[in-house]
């Protein structure tokens, strides 16, 4: 069913409703209209990295870990599995007449905000700091969720529109002031791609204001940009209780009727919250019109018809057996493999069980199930922590010693105990062992969303990039033993790894790797698979390198604009192979405003088969509006066997050659560019870390 047909059906159904019934359907918990055969429906459903908050489901790596795969095809597979399980659960729930929250088909995912500052607590819900990477992965995820069937498999929702990335503590009152250049160059491209390429069915507005307008009541964002400029035809939903913020915290309206008016006039069709309960009162006061209410109602029912809720769907027979089936769980572990980023390796990895008799596993995240999943997660029927994964891997080959070592953030583990009461046990463990794996980091309670956190007053954000003091002291104590140490970090954002970089033998960034992430960590540590993830964010040296958190200017932010050297750059990640782009050329002569095709040779001179990510960055040499450094404009994941060379081809979109000026206008402003082809960025730090130079291709348009 195409949109025109679905809208026609929606118009016919809405025409049979009273105005009161139409207004009632604009709330997230829409009531039944029994006389028309319309069941109750709850629009609030989550599927960030698996069907969330609805019981059992496959728990994939957190979004930031999926982003580290740099793999559009894998991302679409993951989303298709999520949609499959979402349909299966919806089918089963519907047969039981269970239409509660989190049990529907309208999923408020993906989060395609830009992770501009590593202190933002919700950054791990995103695909990182780069607008191009975020756009490509967002489109893949949306296509995977929505499918290409006669009806929509599930409905995706791109959030949070727009310019939304902390601080969490003041998100209900904050005004994100941003230049037109930064708006159109950094904050909007992923949403534009979601609409124009992904065909996303819904868009969610953010809590904050953007340049003075509340996002859920912004005519600039919702009318001009979203609908008029981009041609969006789906529905817009508010973030939860965001419309209430208009009068309660932003103080820009005098009460709920005016807030409902502002949101509805701007084109916010659906209210997650209770403010649209005042729509009828606003109608009686002449603040809104019947036409506005009717149009919003038609839009939300168009979505329901596209999903086949009234006429049936080819997905109605998806059985419950697909939920967390073996095939889906295997895909989740595969995704964790691909997303893990090896930041340092002095040759200690992969570990050889034949040469090791004792292994120490210490740290607060070594046996922490919570740290596997990140936020917005489902419930797995089985979890494998890092400790459990290592124990299973070595079985009878090695003795595994375990010590928790420290609390996640408290100085003591037991009441009345001395400070650092578990560190001595970790030291004893390290002394017993040939190698010690220290598993540090955070979890969803330490970084995340404002109402859900317990991280000592930061409302989900991080005060700094440092590990909590107890964890840092633990690491230093284990290192002081003088035996080999491997650092494994479970976190959703960049941490301060300067000490680990100098003093430990290897560092593996494992993100929040999913329910069975411990299996994936063990597979990487012991060489069952080669790590091949790439950083979707910059690992800064410390917070002194960062601008103020509330400053939304891109100056000195992210790899495209940063002025100092990174500890670990965006796009960086080692493998067990030794892979480089050994040659690159244009497949055909580049022409202005046409796709540019690059053919390159990728060579693995190492001893291990591995996957690798070929990356292309563009540098504009002439325009004064160009980004300070360079920008990602293409990537492709490839597999290269030891001693092998392969050829691959990447296509660079003409948009890569454009700039955005101070008025927010995008156009080609130069005829001289460089394209850098490598397995990392073309910056000096990446070259030093990998030992490989990027291949430069010059483009000069006539």
What function would you assign to each model-found segment?
Residues 685-702:
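Short beta-strand elements
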